[in-house]
């Protein structure tokens, strides 16, 4: 522990109690801990990473804690069961996992296994996801486990789904477009099958935040009320109203305000009740996704948070639907939710190392000499004059003199050496002013530019585009923090820049209570470079948390940085074991994605080296070393070693 700094300070600084409870914390050694079951049994994350590296599992690395999945699933069902008991709701809850959140085999299979006691099912939104579900979801002889088919559907999709009903799956085809109904009925008649049909309603109620734009009357998916009535009339005319089983809606992926959920439940409840009164064979109400994750720990309706907990969510769904049904004397439906983000987000932690840093230049300038240029002397005078009374005025003077120096340099009146001298003094002014600023309770807006200039850049062994695409694409906030040295005071403020040759490959927005920070508090690196062969090398590890939903599957190959190493940890005999290791892409793998064959590339290079040998541009030893390195690189991880 450094003087005047403790792990309690780090806990408050990074808000880990807010977004991480009950799974993540900090131990006395200053390392992040993981409690996969949300109990007292804790793993030291830093020690875990070090042990994985000894197994030749290099960073960047994604660690999946299967027991967190199990715990999230159990908590969701516990909350729904408590709400059902509290409000005397005369029916049950049967959840489904939306496969689109994270389609990886180990995760889906784990959720199917953990979900068996709850009759927990799957939701699919495409033909490939349907193929996963049909082969993964066990047949539940009680018929309570749901397989819900959402998304746009063609004849192949619908025929496969209808035939799969005969295996024993409780499969419901949710109509998103009117034409899907007619194709479904045509196939059903041809195969002599009775379909189970649902309708997805476009509610007037809209979600908030980024995903709110995909809901409401202009939503991408779903049926308007007139279209739902068309479905009703079509089924009635064919004497198939008993096949209309489910009403589905979805008002967004991350609903931060409980008020929006209440409004949606009321609207959907009325639609459900009236369909029942009209004679439809309604049985299920699927409230979709939206159960939010508190990424910043503020517990507010900020877009990266939520102003409710899981029990509040369950209570409002159960109570709201019961009220609607009681008023109309309709038996309440089986409740269904597609809470993928809330189930999967916490179980994955992304670990990466810092490879270097770039801090604002500062070297104590030597006093100026009388013969130096007037602007350089003016900058020096400014530097010497800075104090707590005039620091704002001196900042403006320093900026003006620096701009004049650059102007004169551009017209050829100052030398490169003179410009360097002026910039050195300018940065010294900036550091002195910034030190004063940090001690003030209030800083004027015109000094914010200086604060931004004083932010360091930490270069990380990662591709944001591959491992955290939402941070780049939609400015999604994820908790990021060091996983060790948390008993030391962080002295640097930094943004994170990834390995890609793209200016968007950075993270420059970080969680804060009810706000977004432009920089992250980090520790000074203990190494000037990333030379891991140095016996005194000390790595600096950062973790990005709550990344278990969407990020892996949406990542892309920008600059051909491929999939990263993944490990699965699970509790076995009261000890946490490495359950699976999924090795990340090597260079040959990603080159094949873009249609290059490794053996062809090697042969081309061999020919080039032979030509170079003939022209005496290379020695035989050099050519063999080049070919050896080329072969080794093809088989190596796409990230820095």
Regions found by a protein language model. Give the residues of each.
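Charged, compositionally biased N-terminal leader segments and the immediate start
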Residues: 1-32
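Charged (often Lys/Glu-rich) extended helix/loop segments that serve as interaction or gating elements
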Residues: 15, 316, 322-641
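Low-complexity, highly charged intrinsically disordered N-terminal segments
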Residues: 21, 26-103
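Short, glycine-/Ser/Thr-/acidic-enriched flexible segments
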Residues: 31, 39, 68, 102-104, ...
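Flexible, glycine/charged-enriched surface loops at secondary-structure junctions
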Residues: 59, 63, 85-90, 278-282, ...
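A non-catalytic, amphipathic alpha-helix used as a structural packing/dimerization or gating element
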Residues: 67-75, 230, 267, 316
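A short acidic-Thr-Gly-centered motif at the start of a beta-strand
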Residues: 84-88, 104-116, 327, 450, ...
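Active-site-proximal beta-alpha core segment in soluble small-molecule metabolic enzymes
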Residues: 88-286, 293-296, 307-312, 320, ...
């Amino acid at each position: 522990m450094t003087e005047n700094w403790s792990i309690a300070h780090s806990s408050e600084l990074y808000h880990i109690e807010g977004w991480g409870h009950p799974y993540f914390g900090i131990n006395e050694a200053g390392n992040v801990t993981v409690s996969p079951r949300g109990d007292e049994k804790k793993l030291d994350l830093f020690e875990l990473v070090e042990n994985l590296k000894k197994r030749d599992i290099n960073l960047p690395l994604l660690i999946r804690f299967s027991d967190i999945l199990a715990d999230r699933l159990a908590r969701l069902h516990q909350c729904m069961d408590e709400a059902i008991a509290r409000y005397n709701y005369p029916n049950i809850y049967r959840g489904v996992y939306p496969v689109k959140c994270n389609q990886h085999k180990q995760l889906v299979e784990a959720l199917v296994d953990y979900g068996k006691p709850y009759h927990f099912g799957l939701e699919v939104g495409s033909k490939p996801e349907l193929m996963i579900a049909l082969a993964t979801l066990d047949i539940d002889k009680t018929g309570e486990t749901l397989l819900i088919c959402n998304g746009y559907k063609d004849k192949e999709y619908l025929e496969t789904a209808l035939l799969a009903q005969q295996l024993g799956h409780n499969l419901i085809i949710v109509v998103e477009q009117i034409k899907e109904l007619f194709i479904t009925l045509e196939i059903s008649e041809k195969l002599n099958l009775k379909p189970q049909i649902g309708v997805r309603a476009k509610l007037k109620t809209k979600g908030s935040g980024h995903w709110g734009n995909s809901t409401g009357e202009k939503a991408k998916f779903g049926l308007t009320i007139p279209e739902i009535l068309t479905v009703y009339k079509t089924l009635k005319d064919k004497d198939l109203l008993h096949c209309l089983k489910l009403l589905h809606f979805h008002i967004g992926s991350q609903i931060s305000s409980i008020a929006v959920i209440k409004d949606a439940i009321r609207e959907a409840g009325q639609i459900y009740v009236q369909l029942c009164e009209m004679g439809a064979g309604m049985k299920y109400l699927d409230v979709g996704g939206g159960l939010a994750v508190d990424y910043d720990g503020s517990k507010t309706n900020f877009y990266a948070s939520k102003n409710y907990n899981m029990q509040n969510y369950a209570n409002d769904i159960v109570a709201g639907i019961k009220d609607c049904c009681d008023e109309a004397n309709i038996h309440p439906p089986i409740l269904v939710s597609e809470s993928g983000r809330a189930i999967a987000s916490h179980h994955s932690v992304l670990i990466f190392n810092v490879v270097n840093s770039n801090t604002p230049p500062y070297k104590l300038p030597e006093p100026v000499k009388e013969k130096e240029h007037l602007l350089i002397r003016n900058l020096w005078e400014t530097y010497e004059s800075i104090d707590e009374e005039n620091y704002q005025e001196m900042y403006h003077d320093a900026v003006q003199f620096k701009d004049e120096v650059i102007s004169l340099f551009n017209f050829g009146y100052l030398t490169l050496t003179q410009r360097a001298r002026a910039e050195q003094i300018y940065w010294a002014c900036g550091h002195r002013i910034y030190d004063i600023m940090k001690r003030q309770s209030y800083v004027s807006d015109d000094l914010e530019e200086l604060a931004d200039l004083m932010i360091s850049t930490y270069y990380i062994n990662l591709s944001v585009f591959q491992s955290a695409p939402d941070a780049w694409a939609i400015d999604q906030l994820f908790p990021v923090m060091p996983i060790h040295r948390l008993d030391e005071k962080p002295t640097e403020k930094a943004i994170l820049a990834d390995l890609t040759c793209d200016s968007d490959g950075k993270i420059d927005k970080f969680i804060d209570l009810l706000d977004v920070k432009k920089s992250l508090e980090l520790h000074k690196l203990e190494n000037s470079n990333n030379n891991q062969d140095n016996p005194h090398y000390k790595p600096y590890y950062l973790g990005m948390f709550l990344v278990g939903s969407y990020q892996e599957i949406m990542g892309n190959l920008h600059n051909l940085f491929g999939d990263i190493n993944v490990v699965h940890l699970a509790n076995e005999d009261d000890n946490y074991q490495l359950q699976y290791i999924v090795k990340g892409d090597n260079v040959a793998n990603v080159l094949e994605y873009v249609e290059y064959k490794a053996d062809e590339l090697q042969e081309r290079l061999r020919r080039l080296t032979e030509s170079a040998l003939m022209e005496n541009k290379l020695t035989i030893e050099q050519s063999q070393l080049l070919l050896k390195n080329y072969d080794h690189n093809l088989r190596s991880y796409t990230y820095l070693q």
